[in-house]
Regions:
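Active-site beta-strand termini and strand-to-loop segments that position acidic
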Residues: 120-127, 147-149
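Aromatic/hydrophobic pocket-lining residues that form π-stacking "cages" and hydrophobic walls in ligand
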Residues: 10, 36, 231-232
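Short, hydrophobic alpha-helical segments
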Residues: 95, 202-213, 230-237
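Predominantly a Rossmann-like dinucleotide-binding segment in NAD(P)-dependent oxidoreductases
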Residues: 27-111, 239
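C-terminal capping/lid region of NAD(P)-dependent oxidoreductase domains
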Residues: 19, 46-50, 234-260
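Glycine-rich phosphate/pyrophosphate-binding beta-alpha loops
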Residues: 85, 133-141
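Beta-strand-loop-alpha-helix segment that lines the small-molecule cofactor/substrate pocket
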Residues: 1-28, 43
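C-terminal glycine/acidic-rich active-site capping loop/insertion
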Residues: 146-220, 242, 248-260
Length: 260
């Protein structure tokens, strides 16, 4: 699937047949996000304020030596689609839908067709503001998340050992008055940790298939991610802020891949 049109067609087929598609967003599963969800549910976190996201990875000549990589035909996109789609899914999982996007994309690291650097500014539907910094020209692979709520600051460790599974990294959860650190720590001590990464994802799919309460990724979640990608390319192409949602009349609804 490489367009909103295609995923809407899939949703229509699922609705008609009763079949279920389980998209793959394995970053959602692990102790870091289990703890954050518990704090949000406890209402200790408070109002979402801002967040910063970093996808700073190292992809050079060896990675792009395969002819299909770095091309619109082979990958349907660059770092926005192939490398940072998961971290953007995470922020929508935490903060909810995006309201507007402004994006600047550039190819600064490799001699390829698609982008390998980006700076993105988001306004969320709840009013929170988010920045996302992306490059494939870093010395090592690091995925880092920092989120500020009115009563809580959360930061993932950004370890180069966990770039593809940030939920398994070491996280900080710091209280801000009037909430105390003891209150935060008490919630954290009672969190039942889930399985991480693919194991966690497939466990939730299994629960769904067994008719149990589950937290699987839905096709609507996947559509939200593709709408994000579409808006990023639209913003970069036009050099302006793009409001969500993306309507069917948008020129990129059928495909964000540039026409030759």
């Amino acid at each position: 699937v490489s367009s909103l049109e295609e995923i809407d067609q899939l949703k229509e087929i699922c609705n008609k047949t009763g079949k279920i598609i389980f998209p793959v967003f394995q970053y959602r599963y692990g102790p870091g996000f289990s703890k954050l969800k518990a704090l949000i549910k406890s209402e200790l976190a408070g109002k979402p304020l801002v967040a910063s996201l970093e996808t700073h990875w190292n992809r050079g000549k060896e990675y792009y030596s395969k002819a299909w990589r770095g091309t619109w035909k082979g990958e349907q996109g660059g770092a926005i689609l192939s490398h940072s789609i998961h971290i953007h899914d995470l922020i929508t999982m935490i903060f909810g839908p995006v309201s507007s996007i402004y994006a600047k994309l550039s190819t600064r690291v490799n001699d390829i067709e698609v982008e390998d650097c980006a700076a993105i500014s988001l306004e969320m539907g709840n009013g929170a503001l988010v920045t996302s910094s992306i490059t494939l020209g870093a010395a090592e692979d690091v995925s880092r998340i920092k989120i500020c709520f009115s009563n809580l600051t959360v930061e993932s460790g950004g370890s180069p050992d966990k770039p593809y599974n940030p939920a398994d990294d070491t996280w900080k959860f710091l209280a801000r008055e009037p909430v105390t650190q003891n209150q935060i720590d008490e919630v954290l001590s009672n969190v039942q940790l889930t399985k991480s990464w693919y194991a966690g994802m497939f466990e939730e799919i299994g629960k769904n298939l067994d008719g149990l309460t589950s937290d699987e990724v839905t096709l609507s979640d996947a559509r939200q991610s593709l709408e994000f990608v579409t808006a990023v390319y639209d913003s970069s192409n036009q050099g302006k802020n793009i409001n969500m949602p993306i309507e069917k009349g948008n020129p990129l609804y059928k495909s964000w891949i540039p026409k030759k």
